[in-house]
């Protein structure tokens, strides 16, 4: 399956490889301007059961169940402290289940998170700052 993060459309869409549309989930549809669906990443469990969507307008990470795109959780808020975002823009999860979020513009930082279930248990400084 192909999962598409439609930034300005405030949604995730799912298609078969032949282009057949399967489903979509709107995430904060009232968000204007830059939209809410910046980048997405699959969880690292064998089933890849979760999707993590970075929302660079509302400064959040949304957690969705992959099979039906149900929203399970969200975390983050605007700000400059650990666990907060300024222009959140990218998301990645490594093989050790650590999540990385990157910020553009004035944010200019990467935060590293330790995931347990759907939420991070902690955020730590980027390797360059440790």
Task: Annotate each predicted stretch with a short phrase.
Residues 1-130:
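Eukaryotic scaffold repeat domains enriched in small/polar residues
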């Amino acid at each position: 399956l192909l999962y598409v993060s439609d930034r300005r459309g405030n949604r995730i869409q799912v298609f078969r490889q032949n282009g057949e549309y399967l489903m979509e989930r709107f995430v904060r549809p009232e968000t204007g301007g830059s939209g809410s669906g910046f980048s997405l990443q699959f969880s690292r469990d064998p089933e890849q059961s979760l999707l993590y969507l970075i929302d660079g307008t509302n400064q959040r990470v949304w957690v969705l169940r992959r099979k039906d795109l149900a929203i399970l959780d969200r975390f983050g808020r605007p700000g400059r402290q650990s666990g907060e975002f300024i222009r959140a823009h990218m998301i990645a999860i490594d093989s050790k289940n650590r999540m990385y979020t990157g910020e553009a513009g004035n944010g200019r930082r990467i935060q590293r998170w330790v995931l347990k279930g759907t939420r991070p248990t902690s955020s730590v400084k980027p390797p360059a700052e440790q």
